[in-house]
């Protein structure tokens, strides 16, 4: 191999020889059986410019081949993947991680200072067990709530897709389905995410992906406690099939005494009731948007009383099973409430457009026998009685839905009406 003509020394003792790369789960791909090629001193590290061992592999079917971009020394200094340069623990850019940990690692950028700094860090790495990062990152022991909220716990394999075919964009690709590149519309060149630099990603400056995540963190929603002080129940959603009641109890017992834990396997959720309101508030604050159990991110919300949920369902047109129904199209609006006795003459009960004077005049007739006598004189004709408030068992006027839209009602009472 032809050595570099840069300012670095040509001493082979500074070159790196490794047996296996340092990669994240996303870059490795979803296939557990992959073939990796190894090339000693195949390229220069894009950070320290030293020759290192390059690994190349295909992460999956119809994915592009990937290779290591930086040496293992630079990877261990920042605790990042050798290919995507994202943090191995949180899956976030270095700029976001450093902002969450509230520290700034000023690494030298000149050639001579970088070489001296790298040699000192290699000596420190050789004296450690290799399981923890070195330098400033190794001294940061505290975790951040922002990092737990933004952490990527599951791999994102779409990042390994091929690049966009430039010939297809120009309308000249003749490979069709056999083309190894994507036939999709490219992103807007004015989009800041379209211009990314690997050195900016490593040093944590001017990273557009990090800027986007930091803006998202500043606008994250908050979980405010309900006004009803009697509510001490938390809703935990997204349990899946692997999380049990014991796993939830092991996490939430630290916040206070737990009264009951109800797991609903059908809805993959659970309701955790605490003995005191203070314990429930602490659990909600410590677990909202950052609860991860068995590698699965869970959704934590405050529980609601049955009366409040019933009112919201009637207002939103939601069934007991949680299905939102669409209102029946083509129906007129709700009728106005009955007017007072003095407003009956000008009331419009059927939402009809205004018209001229009526052609027919109502003539008061004597009541038939058996009917109550007319009101005494001076009170006017007794045509309509003012209506009071509806009984409590009647629903307020609102959107009307077809009964067939509710799957819980279809055939629910068929067995009751059938003859034995």
UniProtKB/Swiss-Prot annotation:
Which GO molecular function annotations are given, in alphabetical order? pre-mRNA binding; U6 snRNA binding; zinc ion binding
Cite the residue spans of the region called Disordered: 303-343, 372-420
Domain of life (superkingdom): Eukaryota
- Tell me, what's a Pfam family for it? RRM_1
Q: Where is the composition biased (Basic and acidic residues)?
A: 309-318
| Phosphoserine modification, residue list | 4, 102
Residue ranges of domain RRM in the record: 232-305
Domain-related comment: The C-terminal RRM domain and the zinc finger motif are necessary for RNA-binding.
Q: What does this protein do?
A: Required for pre-mRNA splicing as component of the activated spliceosome. Involved in the first step of pre-mRNA splicing. Binds directly to the internal stem-loop (ISL) domain of the U6 snRNA and to the pre-mRNA intron near the 5' splice site during the activation and catalytic phases of the spliceosome cycle. Involved in both translocations of the nuclear SLU7 to the cytoplasm and the cytosolic calcium-binding protein PDCD6 to the nucleus upon cellular stress responses.
Name of the protein in question: Pre-mRNA-splicing factor RBM22
From what organism does this protein derive? Answer: Pongo abelii (Sumatran orangutan)
Instruction: Give me the gene this protein comes from.
Output: RBM22
């Amino acid at each position: 191999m032809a050595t570099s003509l840069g300012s670095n020394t040509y001493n082979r003792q500074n070159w790196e020889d490794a047996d296996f790369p340092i990669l994240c789960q996303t870059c490795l791909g979803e296939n557990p059986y992959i073939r990796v090629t190894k090339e000693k001193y195949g390229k220069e590290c894009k950070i320290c410019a030293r020759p290192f061992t390059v690994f190349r592999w295909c992460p999956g079917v119809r994915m592009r081949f990937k290779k290591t971009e930086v040496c293992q020394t630079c990877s261990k200094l920042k605790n990042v993947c050798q290919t995507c340069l994202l943090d191995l623990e949180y899956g976030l850019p270095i700029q976001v991680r450093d902002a969450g940990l509230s520290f700034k690692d000023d690494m030298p950028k000149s050639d001579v200072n970088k070489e001296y700094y790298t040699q000192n860090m290699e000596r420190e790495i050789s004296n450690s067990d290799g399981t923890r990062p070195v330098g400033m990152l190794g001294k940061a022991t505290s975790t951040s709530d922002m990092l737990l909220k933004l952490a990527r716990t599951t791999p994102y394999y779409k990042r390994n897709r091929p690049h966009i075919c430039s010939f297809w964009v120009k309308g000249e690709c003749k490979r069709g389905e056999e083309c190894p590149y994507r036939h999709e519309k490219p992103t807007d060149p004015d989009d800041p995410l379209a211009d990314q630099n690997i050195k900016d990603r490593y040093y944590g400056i001017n990273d557009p992906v990090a800027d986007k995540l930091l803006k998202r963190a500043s606008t994250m929603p908050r979980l405010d406690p309900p006004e009803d002080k009697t509510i001490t129940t938390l809703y935990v959603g997204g349990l899946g099939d692997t999380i049990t009641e014991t796993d939830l109890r092991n996490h939430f017992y630290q916040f206070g005494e737990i009264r009951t834990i109800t797991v609903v396997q059908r809805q993959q959720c659970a309701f955790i009731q605490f003995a005191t309101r203070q314990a429930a508030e602490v659990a909600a604050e410590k677990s909202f948007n950052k609860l991860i159990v068995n590698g699965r991110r869970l959704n934590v919300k405050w529980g609601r009383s049955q009366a409040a949920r019933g009112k919201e369902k009637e207002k939103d047109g939601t069934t007991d099973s949680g299905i939102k129904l669409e209102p029946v199209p083509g129906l007129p609006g709700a009728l106005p409430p009955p007017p007072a006795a003095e407003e009956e003459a000008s009331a419009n009960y059927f939402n009809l457009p205004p018209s001229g004077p009526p052609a027919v005049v109502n003539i008061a007739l004597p009541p038939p026998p058996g009917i109550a006598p007319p009101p005494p004189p001076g009170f006017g004709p007794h045509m309509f009685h003012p209506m009071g408030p509806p009984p409590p068992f009647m629903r307020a006027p609102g959107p009307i839905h077809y009964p067939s839209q509710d799957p819980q009602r279809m055939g629910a009472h068929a067995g009751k009406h059938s003859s034995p």
